Amino acid sequence: MASEIFGTAAIFWVLIPIGLVGGALLLKLEGD
């Protein structure tokens, strides 16, 4: 069970920064 919680946390730690960076890049591209 602990491994499942760790895996889920790891997924969020990876996806959240990617989402933030991806969103920022999209806004930058639309701005240009």
From Swiss-Prot:
It is found in: Cellular thylakoid membrane. Belongs to the PetM family. Keywords: Electron transport, Membrane, Photosynthesis, Thylakoid, Transmembrane, Transmembrane helix, Transport. Signal peptide: none annotated. It comes from Synechococcus sp. (strain CC9902). The chain crosses the membrane at residues 5-25. The lineage of its organism: Bacteria, Bacillati, Cyanobacteriota, Cyanophyceae, Synechococcales. This is Cytochrome b6-f complex subunit 7. Component of the cytochrome b6-f complex, which mediates electron transfer between photosystem II (PSII) and photosystem I (PSI), cyclic electron flow around PSI, and state transitions. GO terms for biological process: photosynthesis. The 4 large subunits of the cytochrome b6-f complex are cytochrome b6, subunit IV (17 kDa polypeptide, PetD), cytochrome f and the Rieske protein, while the 4 small subunits are PetG, PetL, PetM and PetN. The complex functions as a dimer. It is a single-pass membrane protein. GO terms for cellular component: cytochrome b6f complex; plasma membrane-derived thylakoid membrane. GO terms for molecular function: electron transfer activity.
